[in-house]
Amino acid sequence: HPIRPDSYREINNFYTMTVYEKGAEVIRMLQTMLGKDGFRKGLDLYIQRHDGCAVTCDDFIRAMADANKTDLAQFSRWWSQSGTPRVTAETSYDETTRTFTLRGRQATPATADQKEKEPLVIPVSVGLLDGAGNDMDLVLVDQPDAVPEKTKTLILSDEADEWVFKDIPENPVLSLGRGFSAPVVFDYGYSREELAFLAGHDSDAFNRAEAFERLVLNCLSEMIDAAEHGDDLP
């Protein structure tokens, strides 16, 4: 069910992990998108308008939008659309132009209550690591005057989009979904070597732990498969 169900049989239906844990992650996404200062401005306006009142999710999101002069109408789908989105990523590196392209595609599987799904607003925080494990400076080709960042938060709001980073001196290792930037499944075809590299070098603690866990699970899966088929353990 979505964070804010359209109906319920009894009030206990609201005391679920979806409402409380996913709901909290959706609020945290706003901070990721708006920045800490922008989120604080929205929270101040929300309290100024509604302190002591009975309010709704719509009142909260409206205060965030008004304080930051931005449109959050599509973001509101997080409250009404059920299911866990999957973001599939593909990358390519052009040595001649020194550009790195990241392509992202989102899809939310049909659920029992909702067959048709609409694109959500998904913040995707990424980093690029060089061969020594250092974070590269990130600037998008279409934002040449932007201040370089070690972690860049991209916004995936359509079904698919792509971003091109400039002045990338070598083929980097992608650190995808830093800080668990959205409650989605990030799908990217990491090799065992890339996972080991991220586990040892990624500056983002969440992704470093995630890479180590995936690496261990992959190794265990291979060992179990080998044992079942009577092969030598890898």
Regions found by a protein language model. Name each.
Residues 1-92, 100-102:
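Hydrophobic alpha-helical and helix-loop surface patches within well-folded domains
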Residues 60-63, 94-95, 227-232:
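Juxtamembrane/interface motifs at transmembrane-helix termini
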Residues 33, 81, 108, 217-218:
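A very general structural signal that marks isolated residues within well-ordered alpha-helical segments
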Residues 48, 122, 199:
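Conserved short-loop catalytic and cofactor-binding motifs
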